[in-house]
Amino acid sequence: MNDLLLAEIKSEQNEQLQTFLLIEEFIFGTKATVQCELDELVGYCQAETDEVAEPIERAEVLINALFVDQLFIDEPQQNWSVISHQLSSALAHKLVSPILKAVLIAHIANACDCQTDIVFVPEKAMLRIICDDNYAIIFDPVTGESLNWHELDVRMNEVSGDPFEITLDIMKQESLVLEHITSLKAAFIREQAYDNALKCVDMLLALNPNDPFERRDRGFLLHQLDCFKVAYDDYQYFVEQCPKDPAAQLLKLQLDKISITDTILH
């Protein structure tokens, strides 16, 4: 990954959706061509909300415009496909992975004068539209369902610390990117697109150098691409860094049986 893209990801000054489109261009090797669709979405939502002066009502109209009119409503999924991580195909199929969808909705909402950010609510990223000093709507980017105060309180009870001092943290762009690329990597692996999965791992390692689990995954991908001698070093690093991990213990037994000098696995 080039230094310019890495700097874009780490910066908190850049428009998040544009950063995600740059990542998409790097991984898929094609320039994103979704500006017309984005402009249409923003234009539609602005037309629906422009005449609504009251902030809470404007937020509700916006959510309805996106999840009902534009068919953004979806069901939670354990695994998201590759196409759901690429904005053009995701919009075409009305199937957008959670983090990408959160970034997209935040972009549209802010363009509609709804002050919106992405916050971490255990265990997921959710959208928050701030209506005034005392009221905000927090909702799931996948289903569009909002949390009431009781549901929010139950979720926040999972966070350690003084309950009177716990606040919702705005997710940094780098955290959103890490979660998005990790999900995309898993989708590529499920679909056996190992070359593209390797691009994801390289990006993750650029952001978190020598993460043992990413080194393990890179070893697996290199192994699948018949580069076992290179993969061996990553496997060995994972075993050394995480000796108590059950996967590392099993992998060590396998590595001990291999003579790296004369064995190439296919």
Please give the residue ranges for each predicted region:
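A structural boundary/capping signal
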Residues: 1-266
